[in-house]
C-alpha cells in the first residue's frame, strides 16, 4: 500500500496531471482525434493556470491550517512532546551528515523550544525513511544530532524510526507511548498536516493536545489571481492537494 500511494501521488499531483493531460492530448490529436486532443490540451492549460497563477491552493491549505488552533497559553507543565517527521532533507542528511532542515523545519525547532522550556518532558520523534527506496537514515535517528547539539539529553529522546506515513506514525507512536508509560502529550506537526494527524491519533486512541506549527498561509487569503509567485503557488497547491487526498483516502479506507 505504501508504494501504491507513492506511485499514485506521482501521477495525480497537479503538475504531473497537467503534463499527462497535455501529453495525452498530443497523442490523441496525432491519432486524428483533434477535437478531443484540443480539449485535453485545454484542460492541461487551465489546470496550469489555476496551479501557477491563482490563490486556489493557498485557500485550500488555509482551510486545513484553521482546523486546529494552538492553545492560547502554553501549559505550565508538559510531560511528553510528540513530533512527526517530514522536517528533514533525508537524502542530503544521509549523504552529508549533520542536519538539513526543509520547509517544515519548524516542527523540530518548536519541539526544541518546548524541550528547553520543559526540561522534564520526554520527546518522541516519530518518523523513519519515507522514500520509495528506503535507503536513507530516517528522521528519528538523524534528529538526535540536532537535539543533543542544543543541550537536550539523549536519554530524553524516544526515537520511533519505523513509520513511513502518518498512519504508521499513529500506530507506532501508540506502541511507544505504552512501552514508555507516557501520557498527556502535545503533538507537534505542520498546521496543514494537523487535521489528518489528529484524526489518525484519535482513531488509534491516543489523547494528544494539538500544537500546530509551520503555517504556510496568512490566514486571511482570498480566492483570486496571483501572478507574482508561480513557483510558490505551485508548491502550496501541491501540498494542499496531497493533504486533501490523504484525508479522503484515509476516510474511504476506514483509517
Where on the chain are the PLM-derived regions?
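Extracytoplasmic/luminal low-complexity segments enriched in Pro/Gly and acidic/polar residues
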Residues: 222-228, 235-255
Amino acid at each position: 500500500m505504501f508504494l501504491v500511494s507513492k506511485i499514485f501521488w506521482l501521477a495525480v499531483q497537479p503538475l504531473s496531471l497537467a503534463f499527462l493531460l497535455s501529453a495525452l492530448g498530443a497523442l490523441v490529436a496525432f491519432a486524428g482525434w483533434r477535437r478531443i486532443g484540443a480539449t485535453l490540451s485545454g484542460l492541461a492549460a487551465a489546470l496550469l493556470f489555476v496551479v501557477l497563477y491563482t490563490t486556489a491552493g493557498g485557500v485550500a491549505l488555509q482551510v486545513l491550517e484553521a482546523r486546529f488552533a494552538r492553545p492560547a497559553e502554553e501549559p505550565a507543565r508538559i510531560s511528553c512532546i510528540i513530533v512527526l517527521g517530514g522536517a528533514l532533507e533525508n537524502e542530503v542528511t544521509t549523504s552529508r551528515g549533520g542536519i538539513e532542515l526543509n520547509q517544515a523545519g519548524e516542527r523540530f525547532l518548536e519541539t526544541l523550544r518546548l524541550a528547553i522550556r520543559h526540561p522534564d518532558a520526554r520527546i518522541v520523534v516519530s518518523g523513519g525513511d519515507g522514500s520509495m527506496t528506503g535507503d536513507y537514515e530516517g528522521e528519528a535517528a538523524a534528529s538526535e544530532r540536532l537535539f543533543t547539539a542544543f543541550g537536550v539529553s539523549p536519554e530524553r529522546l524516544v526515537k520511533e524510526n519505523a513509520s513511513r506515513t502518518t498512519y504508521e506514525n499513529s500506530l507506532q507512536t501508540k506502541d511507544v507511548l505504552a512501552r514508555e508509560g507516557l501520557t498527556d502529550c502535545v503533538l507537534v506537526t505542520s498546521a496543514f498536516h494537523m487535521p489528518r494527524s489528529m484524526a489518525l491519533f484519535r482513531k488509534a486512541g491516543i489523547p494528544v493536545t494539538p500544537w500546530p506549527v509551520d503555517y504556510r498561509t496568512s490566514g486571511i487569503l482570498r480566492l483570486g489571481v496571483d501572478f507574482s509567485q508561480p513557483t510558490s503557488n505551485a508548491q502550496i497547491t501541491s501540498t494542499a492537494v496531497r493533504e486533501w487526498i490523504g484525508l479522503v483516502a484515509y476516510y474511504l479506507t476506514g483509517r
